[in-house]
Amino acid sequence: MPLHSVIVLVLVLCLGWKSNTQEESLSDFTICAEPGPVIPQGNFITIVCSTSGEYDTVRLEKEGSTFMEKKTEPHGKQHRFRIGPVNETITGYYNCIFEKNYVWSQRSNDLQLKVIKENVTQGLAPGPSMTSDTSWLKTYSIHILTVVSVIFLLCLSLFLFCFLSHRQKKQGLPNNKSQHQRSQERLNLATNGLEKTSDIVMDDSLSEDRQTETWTPVAGDLQEVTYAQLDHDSLTQRTVKDVTPQNRVIMAESSTYAAIMRC
C-alpha cells in the first residue's frame, strides 16, 4: 500500500473519532425550562441543566454571558436555576456549561425563553376547591335572601292589618256616639209628644164638662138633642208614633160624640 494512502486513512479515522467524541459530549449536557419556554409576565420559571458526569460548578449563560452560577451537589445530575418574577428582560437564548478542575465543558444546546404580557390572575385557572366553595357560598346567600324577603313581607302584612284595624275602630266610635245621640233625641221627642197629647186630652175633657154643665135641661121644654163633634184631625196630627196603649184609649174617648139633652 502506498504511504500517502496510509496517511489519508489515519487522518480519516482521527477526524471520525473526534466528531464522535464531540457528539457524545454535546449529548451529555441538556437544558430545559419548567413549566415551559413561554412565561406570562410576573410568573416564575425554573431552568434545569442536566449532565451525566460529575462536575464542580455549573453556569447558566445568556447569549454567551454569565447569567447565574453555582456549585454542583455531590452525585447530582440535575441543577436548577429559579428565576422570577420574570419580565421582558428575561427574553433570549440560554446555555448550560460545566467546570471541573478549572476545565470548562462544551455548552449545551440553546434554550429560547419568551415572556408574554398577560395578567397573572387571568392566566391561572381556579382550582376545583375554589369553584366549589364559591358555588356553595352563592347558594347559601340566595337562601338567606329568600328567607329575609319572606320575613319582611310577613311583617309588612301584619303591620298593615294592625293599622287598618286601628283606623276602623277610631272611625267606628264617632258613629256609635252619633247613633246613640240620635236614638236619645228620638226618645225625648216621643216623650214630649206624649206629654203634649195628654195635656190636650185633659183640656178637651174639661171643656166638654163645662159645656154639659151649662146646657142643663129645663122642665117643661121640648127635649132637644144637640151633637157636638170634637176636632179629631187636629188631635191625631199631634200624636207621635210611639204611643202607649193607655194614651190610645184616651184619644179614642175624645173622638166620640157627646150627646147633650136639652129639655
Swiss-Prot record:
<comment type="subunit">
    <text>Interacts with SH2 domains of tyrosine-protein phosphatases PTPN6 and PTPN11. The interaction with PTPN6 is constitutive. Interacts with the SH2 domain of CSK. Binds with high affinity to extracellular matrix collagens, the interaction is functionally important.</text>
</comment>
<feature type="transmembrane region" description="Helical">
    <location>
        <begin position="144"/>
        <end position="164"/>
    </location>
</feature>
<protein>
    <recommendedName>
        <fullName>Leukocyte-associated immunoglobulin-like receptor 1</fullName>
    </recommendedName>
</protein>
<dbReference type="GO" id="GO:0005886">
    <property type="term" value="C:plasma membrane"/>
</dbReference>
<keyword id="KW-0472">Membrane</keyword>
<dbReference type="InterPro" id="IPR036179">
    <property type="entry name" value="Ig-like_dom_sf"/>
</dbReference>
<keyword id="KW-0675">Receptor</keyword>
<feature type="modified residue" description="Phosphotyrosine">
    <location>
        <position position="227"/>
    </location>
</feature>
<keyword id="KW-0393">Immunoglobulin domain</keyword>
<keyword id="KW-0597">Phosphoprotein</keyword>
<dbReference type="InterPro" id="IPR050412">
    <property type="entry name" value="Ig-like_Receptors_ImmuneReg"/>
</dbReference>
<keyword id="KW-1015">Disulfide bond</keyword>
<comment type="function">
    <text>Functions as an inhibitory receptor that plays a constitutive negative regulatory role on cytolytic function of natural killer (NK) cells, B-cells and T-cells. Activation by Tyr phosphorylation results in recruitment and activation of the phosphatases PTPN6 and PTPN11. It also reduces the increase of intracellular calcium evoked by B-cell receptor ligation. May also play its inhibitory role independently of SH2-containing phosphatases. Modulates cytokine production in CD4+ T-cells, down-regulating IL2 and IFNG production while inducing secretion of transforming growth factor beta.</text>
</comment>
<feature type="short sequence motif" description="ITIM motif 1">
    <location>
        <begin position="225"/>
        <end position="230"/>
    </location>
</feature>
<feature type="domain" description="Ig-like C2-type">
    <location>
        <begin position="27"/>
        <end position="112"/>
    </location>
</feature>
<keyword id="KW-0732">Signal</keyword>
<keyword id="KW-0325">Glycoprotein</keyword>
<feature type="modified residue" description="Phosphotyrosine">
    <location>
        <position position="257"/>
    </location>
</feature>
<dbReference type="GO" id="GO:0002764">
    <property type="term" value="P:immune response-regulating signaling pathway"/>
</dbReference>
<feature type="signal peptide">
    <location>
        <begin position="1"/>
        <end position="21"/>
    </location>
</feature>
<keyword id="KW-1133">Transmembrane helix</keyword>
<feature type="glycosylation site" description="N-linked (GlcNAc...) asparagine">
    <location>
        <position position="87"/>
    </location>
</feature>
<dbReference type="InterPro" id="IPR013783">
    <property type="entry name" value="Ig-like_fold"/>
</dbReference>
<feature type="disulfide bond">
    <location>
        <begin position="49"/>
        <end position="96"/>
    </location>
</feature>
<keyword id="KW-0812">Transmembrane</keyword>
<feature type="short sequence motif" description="ITIM motif 2">
    <location>
        <begin position="255"/>
        <end position="260"/>
    </location>
</feature>
